[in-house]
């Protein structure tokens, strides 16, 4: 395990190494069982915005979900093939938000309505996106695939629709871990992403009441994540601010990115979910069949030859005693 004091030199080294790339830091105080995860995801959310041609409101809502899903990868074993799916189903105008993230820091997602109109509200005299209205009331579902057979699924009600609070509620209800979660996205006048990031603070068993109270007061006094990023603060700086006077130590790093592993074989497999007759009907009406990936927008095109491939597949299944589709 990487263990380094979060000194000025270490912070400089991190800045020199990651530069403008997105990444997550994991930090702990020297003497208390507390974990702090801080992620910068500006480029990742901007990639999602461009892929899905998101409106500013959709960018902020989906961006928060992306940041939240990346923070939730703290539940996964680092560097493995474990992954999780975060699904927000509200009755607001954006519809369903789906984000998938894995233990290697790769994330992808999509929203029901990428062109949702702008909804704003006044907060301390400043105009902010009204994410709660964009999302609406509904449920938050987290599906963890730990590579152990059946995935673990948890569903909790959305308590605010602001996404950060909803994730904290999920962690408390489903993981029995008291947590503070902050997620934020700031967009430029042209709709592009200026800042996106967030943090997750968890107090584990054995944390003293004094430290719990100190952390609670400190977190309540922190400015929004995007304001800290606007001041030039990087993930390690925010971690140090949260763990100030607790001898913060760096114990983990992870680069994050928008990544979709879809390919032609995966797309073809989705066609094979159709029966041979359904494929025949499809190609009687169309010269080519198109399969579009919801996560990245790639389009895969197939001709009638897939019908013969489907027949061959069914023939092999029959020979092996498997049930045909």
Swiss-Prot record:
Pfam families with a match to the protein in the record: HSP33
Keywords recorded for this protein, A-Z: Chaperone, Cytoplasm, Disulfide bond, Redox-active center, Zinc
Localization per record: Cytoplasm
Main location: cytoplasm
GO MF annotations, alphabetized: protein folding chaperone; unfolded protein binding
HAMAP family membership: HslO
Protein name: 33 kDa chaperonin
């Amino acid at each position: 395990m990487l263990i380094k004091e979060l000194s000025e030199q270490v912070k400089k080294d991190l800045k020199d190494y990651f530069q403008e790339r997105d990444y997550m830091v994991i930090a702990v105080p020297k003497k208390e069982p507390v974990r702090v995860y801080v992620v910068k995801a500006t480029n990742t959310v901007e990639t999602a915005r461009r892929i899905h041609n998101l409106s500013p409101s959709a960018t902020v809502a989906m961006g928060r979900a992306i940041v939240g899903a990346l923070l939730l990868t703290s539940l996964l074993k680092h560097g493995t093939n474990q992954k999780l799916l975060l699904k927000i189903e509200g009755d607001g105008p954006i519809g369903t938000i789906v984000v998938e993230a894995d233990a290697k820091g790769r994330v992808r997602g999509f929203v029901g309505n990428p062109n949702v109109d702008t909804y704003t509200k006044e907060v301390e005299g400043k105009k902010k996106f009204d994410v709660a209205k964009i999302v609406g009331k509904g449920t938050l579902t987290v599906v963890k695939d730990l590579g152990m057979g059946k995935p673990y699924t948890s569903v909790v009600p959305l308590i605010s629709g602001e996404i950060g609070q909803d994730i904290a509620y999920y962690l408390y209800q489903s993981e029995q871990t008291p947590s503070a979660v902050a997620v934020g996205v700031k967009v430029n006048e042209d709709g592009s992403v200026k800042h996106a990031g967030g943090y997750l603070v968890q107090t584990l068993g054995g944390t003293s009441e004094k430290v719990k109270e100190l952390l609670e007061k400190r977190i309540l006094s922190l400015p929004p994540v995007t304001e800290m990023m606007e001041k030039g603060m990087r993930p390690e700086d925010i971690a140090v601010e949260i763990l100030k006077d607790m001898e913060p130590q760096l114990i983990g790093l992870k680069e994050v990115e928008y990544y979709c592993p879809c390919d032609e074989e995966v797309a073809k497999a989705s066609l094979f979910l159709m029966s041979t007759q359904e494929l025949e009907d499809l190609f009687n009406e169309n010269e080519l069949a198109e399969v579009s990936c919801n996560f990245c927008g790639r389009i895969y095109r197939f001709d009638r030859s897939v019908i013969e491939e489907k027949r061959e597949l069914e023939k092999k299944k029959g020979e092996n005693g498997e049930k045909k589709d």
